[in-house]
Amino acid sequence: MKAAVVGIAGPALLPEEAALFRAFPPAGVILFGRNIAEPAQLARLMADLRAVLPAHAVFMVDQEGGRVARLRPPYWRAHPRARTLGHLFDSNPRAGLRIAWLTGALIGADCAEAGFTVTAAPVLDLSVPDAHDVIGDRALAEDPVVIARLARAVAAGIGAAGIQPVGKHAPGHGRARVDSHLSLPRVETNDLAADIRPFALNSDLPWMMTAHIVFPALDPILPVTLSPRAIGGTIRGHIGFKGVLVTDDLAMKALDGRPADLAQQAIAAGCDIALYCSGELAPTEAVLRQVPVVSPAGAERLATARAGAARRRLSMNPALLAAEREWLGA
C-alpha cells in the first residue's frame, strides 16, 4: 500500500483510475465536491472504490463545517463555521463546548453515513486579525487555550460517530499573510508558543496535517511539509504528536516541483501520508509510482487510528446521538 491518499477526477470511478489503484494501491482516497452529487451516486462511487482499494483504505473528506464542506444541502446538513462556536463559547463556555461536541457529532454522523472514515477537521490554527482570510472564520478563536478546548470537543464529537478527526495545519497556519493554495507563506516570528499550543494540547489526536509554510525559526529554507527539522523537532518533538501525519494537498501552489518528487520528499521528511488531491490521472499515477509504501511505523499509526475510531463508535450510545440530532432539528 503506497503512502499516499489521492483524489479522483469526477463523480464516477474511471476505468483508468481503477486500473491504477489495482496496480499501485494507495493508502486511500479523498473526495471533493466534484465527486459528490447526491447520496445514491456517492454510494455507487464508494462501492466501486471499495472494490479496488486495499481492505483498510482511508476514505477522507474535507468536512469542517462552514464554508469548507463537501457534503452539502439539500442532501446533507449545513454545519456552523468554527468562528460561530468560538462566539458561543465567549457567551457561555459550557454551552459553547456542548454545541462544539454536537457539531462534531453531526459532522461525523454525516461522514459515517456517506461511507467516509476520516474528515480533515478540526482546524487548530489561531485567528489572527491581520492575517490572510484563507483561515479566517475557519479558526475557532484567537486564544490558543480556547481553540484547544473547542477543537477537543469537536474532535470528540467526530470520534463519537466513529470518524477519525484530523487536526490542522500543524504547527499553525493562522499568522500566514498569503494563501498557501496560491503561494508559499513565510512567517517571520521567533515566538510560536501560541501557535503551537492548541496542537500540543491535542497531541493525542489520531491524525494531524502539516502546513505548507516556512517558519525560519524552525527551518530557514524548507516549508514544514518538507522539513525533517520542523517535523521531527516541532511536530513529533515539541508538540509530542504520535499519530498519523498527513501533508496538506501537494497540488497547492505553495510548493514548487513535481508532485511525485514532493510526495517522496514529504515522506522522507517524516510524514506518514502524502496527500495529492488534483484528480488528474497522469500526476496521480506518477505520485503512486514514486512514493514509497507505507512504513511499518506509519502502518502502526494507521491501525491505531482505526482501532481508536472503532472503540469510540462502539462506546457511543446510538440513542443519545439520535436524540440530540432530533433536539437540534437535524
What are these regions, as identified by a protein language model?
Residues M1-F59, G65-Y75, A330:
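N-terminal hydrophobic targeting/anchoring segments and the immediately downstream early-domain regions
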Residues A3-P15, A82-L102, H181-A193, A251-G257:
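Active-site mouth loops of central-metabolism enzymes
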Residues R34-V52, R149-E300, T304:
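Second-shell residues forming the walls of enzyme active-site clefts
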Residues A37-A43, F89-A109, E142-L150, D191-A193:
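Glycine-rich anion/phosphate-binding loops
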